[in-house]
UniProtKB/Swiss-Prot annotation:
GO molecular function: serine-type endopeptidase inhibitor activity; toxin activity
Glycosylation sites: N109, N270
UniProt organism field: Ixodes ricinus
Taxonomic lineage of the native organism: Eukaryota, Metazoa, Ecdysozoa, Arthropoda, Chelicerata
UniProt family annotation: Belongs to the serpin family.
Protein name as catalogued: Iripin-2
Ligase found in the keyword field: no
Length: 397
């Protein structure tokens, strides 16, 4: 009888692990789909680069989702892609719980630090259930501040938290004190540092042409690497794809270079998560020469309008239902996102932070030259979990 009990328990635990893995995979797919949709919604053009962390935005909005109810929660579920992958409301929080723990516990040769926090007006009492969700599902730190009485000290606290969690790569998220009526700021910060598995040799870096906007030639520092790397050209979107691994091989940078100099916008509009994943699965290792510009991007976005264009609307209006946070009538007034990335011969350093402000109411024998000399897309991802942590579009250098 005891032997039967043990077998039953083991089977039950295995089933739980399988369910958790399935929920995490759904969350990753939802976040990645959301990232591509947000990429299309953000302003871009020949003179404007794009860089952001879909994971950071999704995590911050996920903390708002935990306190949303009714239509507000439904819009978030649809806009963030949860409903598209059949994630239930409870399933979202369970998936975040186990995914957050796995990212923290998985050993890696690269550095990935993800942190969540809530800066809470000291007079605001959060519902116990919401505090529990923030801490258990997101590992969030809870901090009391005084946006009304000590606005400068409050914003300084938020900015110092951001600076610390991004290893000083982002100095501040907010340039001035927030509205004194602010009751809650939900924060996510993400920092990545990875060394190339095969480093570019500094002595091989030299000035080469890059066509800004696909048409205007400029001379930029361009790195050179000859190695066996995963590569392929895909006819459907007329795009070359290279995947550059970081040391340890658990993180990579995938670079998508359209054949046409001005083809990046069309590529962006037609790229889907499934197509992206299929591209990566179909890559083949071969000897190639990579010519990649060194670059550093710094971006800041107010995400209210882009999120509204994705159908997330009511949370910003007076009729928002955030009754899972507190009994008061609350609404989100702003979603601010800041990101920075630097790519050089050694590797990549990237960081991003999001703040949600809540107020009342083909293979061949010949070597290939992968010449990145015109606008392109890039993605920094985890090969174990398939999470896309950072997305960029380089139009101008």
């Amino acid at each position: 009888m005891e032997d039967f009990k043990m077998k039953t328990l083991a089977a039950f635990l295995s089933l739980l692990v399988l369910c958790w893995a399935q929920e995490e995979a759904k969350l990753t797919k939802a976040n990645n789909r959301f990232g591509l949709r947000l990429l299309r919604a953000l302003p871009s053009g020949p003179e404007k680069n794009v860089f952001f962390s879909p994971y950071s935005v999704s995590a911050a909005m996920g903390m708002a989702f935990a306190g949303a109810r009714g239509q507000t929660q439904q819009e978030l579920s649809q806009g963030l892609g949860f409903s598209d992958v059949d994630l239930t409301d409870a399933g979202v929080l369970d998936a975040y719980t186990h995914h957050t723990e796995r990212l923290k516990s998985t050993p890696s040769n690269s550095t990935l630090d993800v942190a969540n926090a809530a800066a809470i007006q000291r007079t605001l009492a959060l519902l116990n259930s919401y505090e529990s969700a923030l801490q258990s599902s997101f590992g969030a730190e809870l901090h009391k501040v005084d946006f009304a009485g000590e606005p400068q000290a409050a914003v300084d606290f938020v900015n110092n938290w951001v600076k610390r969690k991004t290893h000083d790569k982002i100095e501040k998220l907010f340039n001035e004190p927030l509205d004194p009526d602010t009751l809650l700021v939900l924060l996510n910060a993400i920092y990545f540092k990875g060394e190339w598995n095969t480093a570019f040799v500094k002595e091989h870096t030299e000035k080469r042409q890059f066509f800004n906007g696909g048409v205007t030639p400029v001379e930029v520092d361009t790195m050179r690497l000859e190695a066996r790397i995963k590569y392929r050209f895909f006819d459907d979107l007329q795009v070359e794809v290279v995947e550059l691994p970081y040391r340890g091989l658990d993180y990579t940078m995938a670079i998508l270079l359209p054949k046409e100099n001005t083809g990046v916008e069309g590529l962006k509009q037609n790229l889907t998560v499934d197509r992206f994943q299929n591209y990566l699965s179909d890559l083949r290792e071969r000897k190639i020469t990579v010519l990649l510009p060194k670059f550093k991007l710094e971006t800041k976005y107010s995400l209210k309008a882009p999120l509204q264009s994705l159908g997330i609307k009511q949370i910003f209006e007076s009729g928002a239902d955030l009754s899972g946070i507190n009994d008061e009538r609350l609404r989100v007034s702003a979603v601010e996102h800041k990101a920075v990335v630097e790519v050089n011969e050694e590797g990549t350093v990237a960081a991003a932070t999001t703040g949600v402000v809540i107020v009342p109411y083909s293979l061949g024998p010949e070597p290939v030259v992968f010449r990145v000399d015109h606008p392109f897309l890039f993605f920094i991802r985890n090969t174990r979990t398939d999470d896309i942590f950072f997305v960029g579009q380089v139009n101008k250098l």
